């Protein structure tokens, strides 16, 4: 016999943030590698209409054998697997049958009001954004003195249609901004629409992003 009333919370969209404790140890080597890619102008050439004043490398960043790159890849993979375990409630036995498959990885360097329009990551399950250099990201006044979000990542609600009457006020926030912090990794469901707001600062905004799926061992 069911005890009524009951409540079921469904279709949650979880965004996780992790701090890389080895950030300072690898920061300079990673930045040098990113700017070396930029100087050689090996750009992705993908969705250029959605980007402005933004360098995007080719999608093979984690294939480099540099120790700093491989250390960051390991950190991202371990963080991703902890997300998979937490969000699904899997036990250690089942987790031992799974492994992360980072399909694409790339660097972004942004300044001079550079931005990336709203988009999703298709055909993958989880996305990651690692803040290598956050610069002056955060709330800042624009040229007209109006406060705006500078270089934040904005995530949009996947719930597209509802009536915003008094009963639905818990859904009133249709977007949330995450302010970059050096050495922080954000992991999010790839179906979430997200963007990078325009950024300007004395230092470039530098991030490493990736797409992934979770595979099961044979």
Regions found by a protein language model. Give the residues of each.
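Catalytic core of Fe(II)/2-oxoglutarate
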Residues: 167-218
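Non-heme Fe(II)/2-oxoglutarate
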Residues: 2-90, 94, 115
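Short, solvent-exposed loop/turn segments at secondary-structure junctions
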Residues: 23, 135, 160, 192-194, ...
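Catalytic core of non-heme Fe(II) oxygenases with the double-stranded beta-helix
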Residues: 101-185
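A short coil-to-beta-strand element that immediately follows conserved catalytic motifs
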Residues: 89-105
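Hydrophobic (often cysteine-bearing) scaffold residues that line and stabilize catalytic clefts
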Residues: 72, 120, 204
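Short hydrophobic/aromatic beta-strand or adjacent loop that forms the aromatic wall/cage
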Residues: 12-16, 127, 205
